[in-house]
Amino acid sequence: MSLHQINNTQVPGRLHGKVAIITGSTLGIGAAIARLFVHQGARVVLNSHNHDTAAECVSSELGPEHSLFVQADVADASAMRALVDQAIAKFGKVDVLVNNAGMNVFSDPLQMTDEEWQRCFSVDLEGAWNTTRAVLPFMLEQAAGSIINIASVHGHKIIPGCFPYPVAKHALIGLTRSLGIEYAARGIRVNSISPGLILTEAIQSWFASCPDPVAEQQRQAALLPCRRIGEPDEVAYTAVFLASDEARFINATDILIDGGRSQLYHD
């Protein structure tokens, strides 16, 4: 059965009974995570800074019994507190938080504007902290919770011309490890996932903007040891595992999903 077809008659899934907040969840990796979470029995709070066609499509697909869409900018701490309050009001608890919302800021360090620097960190780092800080009191009260930060291979390896995005993603992995240790004894797990090149709508748009889209996609695939580009569902399955009780002894850990690219010294 397709992951995009929600079948309510199935036996309980790996996330049966859990409630998850997933930021940036109307497209790409976030939408794939939301769909798979519901497929595995969770109820989800969808989020984007825009209430657009993509948001309406995912909300309609998952249905009001299984999902709630809240428009909010993760850079706005008060908006994220309100989002968590709405999640509690709708579903009664929050078991899982997936901090997926992010943005690419790729620039030359000396040509980058102050606004670009601030926006990159306000979304890619502070956005995760704003939502985490809002949800932590509820997780601590129930002495259980799984927080999953979607970082990046850029948090491990540096590509010239991508500043300051790798700085923010390195910091996000540091935040993951620090909070994971800080709250481990109180039932909270904090882990991160670092995707490499994943065939999201944004990447497809980037390929389309290239002079020869097919050649560029083939070139990018050839850089990977597995000779193919990753799919959003492949990230989503790892998020399901980390959200589930199967991962109860995994904490303060980052998982790379890049087809082995980051481990390749030379090709």
Walk through the language-model features, giving the residues of each.
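C-terminal substrate-recognition "lid" of short-chain dehydrogenase/reductases
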Residues: 129, 228-257, 262-263
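Active-site helix of classical SDR
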Residues: 132, 168, 176
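Residue(s) in the substrate-gating loop at a strand-loop-helix junction
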Residues: 152
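Alpha-helical segment proximal to the catalytic Tyr-Lys
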Residues: 137, 181-185, 248
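Conserved glycine-rich cofactor-binding loop
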Residues: 19, 26-27
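Substrate-binding pocket helix/loop in short-chain dehydrogenase/reductase
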Residues: 108-109, 113-121, 220
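Short C-terminal tail/terminal secondary-structure segment
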Residues: 2-12, 157, 240, 251-267
